[in-house]
Amino acid sequence: MRNVRVVAIQMQCAKDVATNIQTAERLVRQAAEQGAQIILLPELFERPYFCQERQYDYYQHAQSVAENTAIQHFKVIAKELQVVLPISFYEKDGNVLYNSIAVIDADGEVLGVYRKTHIPDDHYYQEKFYFTPGNTGFKVWDTRYAKIGIGICWDQWFPETARCLALNGAELLFYPTAIGSEPILDTDSCGHWQRTMQGHAAANIVPVIAANRYGLEEVTPSEENGGQSSSLDFYGSSFMTDETGAILEQAERQAEAVLLATYDLDKGASERLNWGLFRDRRPEMYQRITD
């Protein structure tokens, strides 16, 4: 029996990078005290969700893995606490900018980087202004405690993401996220968001862990953003499922949270074999997906 203790962290993001890193560290330490071995923080937690507006100055936030403050900080924390930490960050690689994850193993070493594949472009979720679509493909990391696959926010809406990660051997699926109110559509997408990922877990027989931010984030009108006045209310509701998609743990909409679940990885592997979903696949019939 291979058990792994996993945490999803839900936090509010302040305007100051140092404050957000301190908050994240406090919650990571709290998770480690509860026995967590793999800890997921939300998407782009270093700052407010800057993609709500378009400002050329924000390109300066992008950094390489070696330069990024959060990555370098949490390499030390991961080694001290012996935990795996996927860290979301705004990546600069030469002249190209990405929305990325650096996976830090429990020895403090960076195993590699995943770059977000699907880049949204909607009212106040204006990510195409800041990010180039990722070129890494869907990657799975063999960490000290489990083989983990990671998609970033909008990736979670695409079943292809989860299926590719499962085919690549992921035992757990992680989705760091920044999602909240819809500025144009008169809808609360929270339930839809959760059910989409529950379906990925059920269809692949792999647990899903989703970590979101929470709180109201407002944009102040300025000459640089064309006088935009707007706000997004991030609805939290981070959650963790089992391999059938059933929700094991869920956070409130507007509160800090450290969600903890224990997964039996051998049980998950056995269930995937028993159900035969991967045995009975017919890839030769799926050409329409890539047309």
Please place each PLM-identified region on the residue numbering.
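Residue-level detector of high-confidence beta-strand sites
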Residues: 100, 113-115, 175, 250-252, ...
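Cysteine/selenocysteine-centered motifs that mediate thiol-based redox chemistry or coordinate metal-sulfur cofactors
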Residues: 138-168, 268-291
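Active-site-proximal beta-strand elements of phosphoester/diester hydrolases
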Residues: 3-13, 100, 140, 146-155, ...
